[in-house]
A protein has these predicted regions:
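Bacterial N-terminal signal peptides that target proteins for export
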Residues: 2-14
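C-terminal motif of bacterial Sec signal peptides marking the signal peptidase cleavage site
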Residues: 20-25
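Secondary-structure end/capping motifs
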Residues: 230-308
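Conserved C-terminal helix/tail region of periplasmic/extracytoplasmic solute-binding proteins
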Residues: 299-338
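Pocket-lining segment of extracytoplasmic ligand-binding domains
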Residues: 97, 170-171, 176-263
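Bacterial signal peptide processing site
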Residues: 27-29
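Short, glycine-/small- and polar/acidic-enriched structural segments
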Residues: 33-164, 171-172, 188-191, 207
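Small-molecule pocket liners
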Residues: 49, 117-123, 205-206, 216-220, ...
């Protein structure tokens, strides 16, 4: 087995738990200092994370160094941000909009890689709905997860059509609960997220409004303390992501199978997400393309009161990216499971 030479300080890292845990608002409540744990998330909206977890690459690569890998599931970008903020996570998956929001509000994170360029958000209506246009959303009840790309997709959609978030009633529900609310008639529309959205579509829900430009990239983020104290361990995570990117390109059907298994989807639905609505082969280095998207989203945060002022947005844009890890990504450092 390959052994990587590095000095681990890992002071301040959080304790592993016996089983995979879903991140909730209480994430990190029992977190204590541990010298030998890497806390990293997986999420159904981040297929590369599912590949890495499924293949066991981090465990194999880090075994000789005594580092235990603790996987925690992020139910949405807001939950990943909670995990990063509470230091229950060292590395977490969010949409770009959520990463900017967290940084602008003082969470000490850096974006160290891109994991996808997806079309993962849309405005979803139930089968047979009388909502035929965005204008028809005025006065309606819409499920959305605040602090995530679908929520900001909704805000941008309303603004583009001469409305504001105050013209609708937002039910702040986690993504899966939003689909449930749409399905049982509790809300009129849902700001959806794949892969749940693809499953809803298969069951008859309609993607009433789509706009690729309102989707931000998939951002992989890490806490500043982790990057400062454990840069080589952070590099290993990015190397594993590079290996997953290459593996996904060579094995798209197997990637869809992994997603289907974790998300509880039928394989045709998972295939739609992977093959039609996810670009996993995106350049992993954060840079100008992502910055331009966030520059458009940032002022919206101030307008709706999620960030206090534009100065905080500008400072976050200047300090959010650390491209050095993705620039040095090397999949050959990762040990495959035997």
């Amino acid at each position: 087995m390959k052994s990587l030479t590095r000095t681990h300080r890992l002071l301040g890292l959080t304790t592993a738990v016996a089983a995979t845990v879903a991140l909730t608002g209480c994430a990190g409540e029992n977190a204590e200092a541990s010298a030998e744990t890497l806390n990293v998330d997986f999420a159904t909206y981040n297929p590369l994370s599912l590949i890495i977890k499924d293949q066991g690459w981090l465990e194999e690569t880090l075994e000789d160094e005594g580092v235990e890998v603790n996987w925690l599931q992020s139910a949405g970008s807001n939950k990943a941000n909670e995990g990063l903020r509470s230091e229950a996570l060292h590395v977490g998956s969010t949409a770009g909009s959520a990463a900017l929001l967290a940084r602008a509000n003082g969470t000490p994170i850096k974006t160290i890689a891109m994991y996808s360029q997806p079309e993962w958000s849309a405005i979803v209506t139930p089968e047979g709905s009388d909502i035929a246009s965005v204008e028809d959303l005025r006065g309606k009840k819409i499920a959305a997860t605040k602090g995530t790309d679908p929520y900001f997709f909704l805000v941008q959609t309303l603004q583009e059509h001469g409305m504001t978030i105050d013209d609708v009633t937002v039910e702040n529900l986690q993504h899966a609960d939003g689909w449930s609310a749409l399905n049982n008639g509790s809300v009129d529309a849902w700001a959806g997220l794949d892969p749940i959205m693809a499953g809803a579509e298969e069951e008859g829900a309609e993607l009433m409004y789509r706009n690729l430009d309102f989707n931000t990239y998939g951002f992989l983020n890490a806490t500043e303390d982790f990057l400062e104290n454990e840069p080589e361990l952070a590099q290993t995570v990015i190397d594993a992501y590079q290996k997953a990117r290459e593996w996904a390109a060579e094995n798209p059907e197997e990637t869809a199978e992994i997603l289907a298994d974790v998300a509880g989807l039928e394989e045709p639905i998972a295939n739609k997400v992977i093959l039609e609505r996810s670009n996993l082969d995106v350049d992993p280095v954060p840079g100008d393309a992502q910055r331009s998207v966030l520059e458009a989203v940032g002022p919206i945060f101030v307008e709706i009161g999620d960030v206090s002022d534009q100065e905080s947005i500008d400072e976050a844009l200047e300090t959010l990216f650390d491209p050095s890890f993705a620039e040095n990504a090397d999949s050959s450092t990762i040990t495959e499971s035997s």
